[in-house]
Amino acid sequence: MDPRRIWRVALLLLVAGANLQAEERIRLLVQNSPLAGFRYHAGAALWRELRVGDALELAREPDNPHDANAIAVRWRGYKLGYVPRSENAALAWGLDRGTPLRARISALTEHPNPARRVRFEVFVE
């Protein structure tokens, strides 16, 4: 599906829910992904401190020499890795337009393959 179409639907739902009370806000799950590059950043050193549900920060890196759509995933200021290249275009498009995105850890698995250790969810609120 075209990333722009996904974002149009998400933004339409947000506008429709703009008049709801704070406790009735709509939170739309737009992506659930594995964390890319976990073994190359601070993830291994922080593994024991990470918890399912912990908030994550998504930080665009438009000048990244390897991927113009790069989005770093940070936990408490530490870079854990990236949104996978194959899944970052729609999120980059949204972040570049100021869409309020929230992310959190959705799963932690002690797997020998670091690419399978952390999954995260991204929401539009």
Predicted regions and their residues:
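Conserved active-site motif detector
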Residues: 2-125
